[in-house]
Amino acid sequence: LLEFNMLNTLENLIKLARERKSSPVEGSYTNKLLSDKSLSKAKVLEEVNELIEAVEENSNKIHEAADVFYHLLIYLEANDIKIEEVMSELEKRKK
């Protein structure tokens, strides 16, 4: 059940990013990130740093990890990097 929910959540996030990219919604934070690659890049860097701090301080780790996932997925989509291709690359690296 947990695995199903994880995959479902990830698929929904990817679907949201692609829907917002093809049909922008005014005022959407996701659309703001998709349309401003510089902002999207800055947010990925910021969120990774916040995650590192959270891990070191043992505080808010899950929240910050979720922020990293979200912002990275949006950054990839904004730059036309398909998550399927990333997953395929990871699959090739299995030993």
Regions found by a protein language model. Give the residues of each.
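Flexible "arm" and connector segments at domain edges
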Residues: 1-65, 69-95
